[in-house]
């Protein structure tokens, strides 16, 4: 008690003297609760009736004091009207409900494709919200995309530094010098001197594109104009008469000439040679051209070596991968063998346990059967003893009657004997009549069942067999088995009829064609998918039926084989295993086969019941 009081005092001292202002809605709630618990007095009292006994003379001082009392008391302030705030609550609930519904819609749109289409199309800002959460999910799964988003490749960064524009770019005028009759210049007269090289020089530039030729010519002109500066006039070198033109480079002479990069380099080099050959000072470029040829040869050799190294590295990687795959295959085979051995041991244990259980159950069943057989034998023995006692009693009575009759030698004894004989004969005739009636009814039932079956087999088109079925029901009487068999038949089967086996096979072939057309359709296929499946079904090859495969073509082939064998039950099971559009298209055919199977099964049950009744009579 002392500790609790001390703690309460410390808490009061530690708290601030100024009370903390409460929230507005809490203050209103507290004020309303305080006003509800506070008592108020009315300003004017209700008048009390004055009786003659209460009207007594009062002094003036007392009256003055009494009148001054009510005026001195303060009048209480009226209670403020309490605001309900219904609109505010409704608005808050509406905002919360809308937010929850919108959030639930976004969540369902992320999970379901159908609801995603509806939500993004009809709900305002639905597409932006779903896209925002999908991007968040994508960045959560692949965080490296944000890092590599603004990263550029080194090649793209270096492109700006590699591209340079020369100072004297563009075209400039130049006087054309007349060559005159210089035999050293290339022309038609050079074809007789070097026919093979001239052909190569004319064929190879023609293989290049016109744009490449134009670029090469411009580049050659710029290079030719650069040394011409006004500082000093270069000395004109004497022309070398009879200098041979520079020959172009063949693809076959370059290593790895079939590579696209090498071909482009050779084309560019040949264009440069063509431009240099067209120049008057082509002889002084022979050494750089020869050096460029050697560099091209080296480039081809380097490409060949790099490709060989890459091929060797790829071969080593392939060999390593083969070794890894072989090791994985051996490990998988080992695990498979272990699992198979474990499964075999487990199956063996389960088999032994099941065999012991079956043996125990069989022993118990044998003991039960033996006990029942013993009880039946004892009961039969007791019945035989009772019958023998009755027979002895009857013989005793008969002997007594014989003695009485012999003694009396009257007609009364003979009359009683005749009456008993007649009664026995009537009993015998009645029993045989019941046997004959039962046999006749059984035969009539069998004939009626055969009539229904023959009517179904002879009909080329589905024909109702209500009359035959009514005849079977009337002949069966109150047999519950026959009534249950007839009740199991679909009313549409005997009212409209069922197709024959040939009609079922013929209709199956038509249905199979439609199923093959729709075999490639998904469950939510549209018009384009239907058209594509129809076109592809025309070019599909038929294959043999496989026992373990569940594709549409194998199921159709197995069903057709079963129908040709007359096994409708297994054929219906095969067709029922289809899925998607194939099952939807074969639904009517399956319904017809089910009705046929139901009718056949009911007829077999009725026929079996008729045979059982015959055996019971016998």
Swiss-Prot record:
Give the residue spans that cross the bilayer: 90-110
Q: How does it sit in the membrane?
A: Single-pass membrane protein
Coiled coil location? 289-403
Q: Which UniProt keywords are given for this protein, alphabetically ordered?
A: Coiled coil, Membrane, Mitochondrion, Mitochondrion inner membrane, Transit peptide, Transmembrane, Transmembrane helix
GO terms, biological process:
cristae formation
Look up keyword Mitochondrion and say if it applies.
yes
What are the boundaries of the region Disordered? 44-81, 148-244
Q: Which intervals lie on the Mitochondrial matrix side per UniProt? A: 42-89
In the UniProt record, the transit peptide is located at 1-41
Q: What is its main location?
A: mitochondrion
Compositional bias ranges of the Basic and acidic residues kind: 209-238
Repeat: present as a keyword of the record? no
Going by the entry's taxonomy, the superkingdom of the source organism is recorded as Eukaryota
Q: Which residues lie on this side of the membrane: Mitochondrial intermembrane?
A: 111-618
Tell me the first and last residues of the signal peptide.
none
A Gene Ontology term for the protein's cellular component: MICOS complex
Q: Name one Pfam family in it.
A: Mitofilin
* SUBUNIT field: Component of the mitochondrial contact site and cristae organizing system (MICOS) complex.
Q: What family is this?
A: Belongs to the MICOS complex subunit Mic60 family.
Q: What does this protein do?
A: Component of the MICOS complex, a large protein complex of the mitochondrial inner membrane that plays crucial roles in the maintenance of crista junctions, inner membrane architecture, and formation of contact sites to the outer membrane. Plays a role in keeping cristae membranes connected to the inner boundary membrane. Also promotes protein import via the mitochondrial intermembrane space assembly (MIA) pathway.
Protein's recorded name = MICOS complex subunit mic60
Per the UniProt record, the source organism is Emericella nidulans (strain FGSC A4 / ATCC 38163 / CBS 112.46 / NRRL 194 / M139) (Aspergillus nidulans)
Please name the taxonomic classification of the source.
Eukaryota, Fungi, Dikarya, Ascomycota, Pezizomycotina
Source gene?
Answer: mic60
